[in-house]
């Protein structure tokens, strides 16, 4: 079985390049899998001989190449269609349809303006706006950059947690970034030090799983806010995070997806 790992373009891994590479290496290591950058022109040639592809790719070209591999019967994780569905505005619709709690548009503590078409590539793609004037300026900046697909969400006080999961396995973990200080852009500091409010871990896992299922994205991560009364909302959801806080466990769970796919494939 030939296993290939497709590394996402570096612009999609801001401040996380090595962490993203590390999880991909951990996943493909037992098979001595080859890792290739999604923008490498030789990607189609490599995919032509692959049996299993673990992909973090996000560019349209790479996703099209992976579509073709899927049509040939190659197991691709995450599926390219799932990655496309992880655009923020698409996820918002899927979350509402799947009864997954998300922030309202209006609140009393400011707003977050988020680029909706692709994952954040820089700090300028996710902007905190403390008042209406700041929101108007941020919207004008988006328009000047040609960004007309965006999401506006109210900022909600509470504990910020990061969660990580792999569908069809027992793997689901969450962490408080305020405890260890790990951060991509530093936005987590807006919610301050965590209070570790009590909440239903089962319900959080269930909500994240519903969204991952709707998005067809089995390898996922995201952020949630826990309020003092234990209510939570999902504020972000990502295809294949770095899993840096739980890399070994995550890699094992991701590999389980291949075994499950093989078990469900009809034998000739």
Residue ranges of each PLM-predicted region?
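Active-site nucleotide/adenylate-binding loops and adjacent lid/helix of ATP-dependent enzymes
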Residues: 2-10, 71, 81-160, 198-202
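Short, solvent-exposed loop/turn segments at secondary-structure junctions
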Residues: 10-11, 59-60, 82-84, 118-119, ...
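Conserved N-proximal alpha/beta basic substrate-recognition cap immediately N-terminal to
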Residues: 8-104
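A long amphipathic alpha-helix within ATP-dependent nucleotide-binding catalytic cores
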Residues: 183-234, 238, 246, 253-267
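A short beta-strand motif that forms the metal-chelation/ATP-contact edge
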Residues: 50-54, 114, 163-165, 230-245
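Short glycine-/acidic-enriched loop or helix-start segments at secondary-structure transitions
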Residues: 15, 63-66, 88, 122-124, ...
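Anionic group-transfer/hydrolysis microenvironments
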Residues: 116, 155-156, 164, 223-225, ...
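Phosphate-binding site of ATP-dependent enzymes
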Residues: 129-215
